[in-house]
Amino acid sequence: MKDIVKSFLIIGQSNMAGRGHLHEVKPIINERIVMLRNGRWQMMAEPINCDRSVSGISLAASFADAWCREYKEGKIGLIPCAEGGSEIDEWDVGKTLYNHAVSEARFAMKNSQLTGILWHQGESDSMGGKHEIYYEKLHRIMQGFRKELDAPDIPIVIGGLGSFLGQSGFGKNCTEYMLINQKLKQFAFEQDNCYFVDAAGLACNPDGIHINAVSQRKFGLRYFEAFFHKQHILGPLTNEDERVLVLEARTHTKTEKTFLLSMQMALGDISYSDFKAQLAQTGE
């Protein structure tokens, strides 16, 4: 069983899909991290969740890298199903987003072990009193996933909304985000095997609504701490900035170096002759 991929269902809206700017952080390249794409497990490359052409850095990559640091064997698989701008009603049992996530998870489970569900959603419900029945809707959705995926005890990690909301840009209208956070926290505290992750101290892009790339790296580390230790994370981690730097400083394997060079050549960042020269230096 140690060789089977341990998979995680990634669901929610744009801050789970990821809108962090790609150029603001070093890429995470790890041959033990795979993502489900076109029905196959592919070596992970960001953006992972391509719901929009502007998709970028999400919390999933640093979550997965932290998993690899803790578990020395095996692979982790990411099942990206987040949809930018989605309200919780769009995730209701039987709706398109819900059905798609169930379908992708079931497909992945043919050759992986579903190990957790990562959820981040609520910005689109942070206005107009939608918080009043948010808990009930979230409960129905998560119970549905656990039942349909035959995983009644699967861990669910739920992230809070950033305190930068309600101030500017696209996030200016999200004035009830604190009330949504109360519901998210209440749900995680009351339900078995559910863990809340606070977004305290995270920063946003200039648009006022999307978590920036560096903060997404931090958020992913917090999500993993919640999953691994089976506890709520109610603030920033100790030495969080340093831990992000450790992610970026990891020495790549030959396979990872080849993958990165191939990607750079395909994107036109290096010439074919440069690709061959640098590939030779890796020993491949």
Where are these regions (language model features)?
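Cell-envelope and extracellular/periplasmic
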Residues: 1-284
